[in-house]
């Protein structure tokens, strides 16, 4: 199966999970287009000053891979800086958040929500 960018679903989420600004979520594949146990296979774009607020994942795990930009990542209360090529995982029952605290560069992450 091939899916062209123009056929992907893009959603703008304002104050996602209590964060600042907006997150642009692009579903690379939608449910029904794959057989695995996932809730999201896509990218998330955060412009400078935007973030996804702290939240807990229950019955799922979330993986981020930084495609471009610099992320300020809260991993269970510990803040880390992630750069292009870095990845992180939030396991079930854990808390995380992600922010673009830069002044002039976008942050784009590949995101996978694995359900169980």
Model-derived regions: residue spans:
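A short, N-terminal "cap"/entry segment at the start of jelly-roll beta-barrel domains
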Residues: 1-38
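Conserved short histidine dyad/triad with adjacent acidic residue
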Residues: 27-31, 42-57
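A generic "binding-loop/recognition-motif" signal
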Residues: 48, 59-60, 78, 94-95, ...
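Short beta-strand His + acidic residue motifs that chelate non-heme Fe in jelly-roll/DSBH
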Residues: 54, 73-74, 90, 96-103
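Short acidic-glycine-tyrosine-enriched beta hairpin
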Residues: 77-92
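A short hydrophobic beta-strand segment most commonly corresponding to one strand
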Residues: 89, 104-116
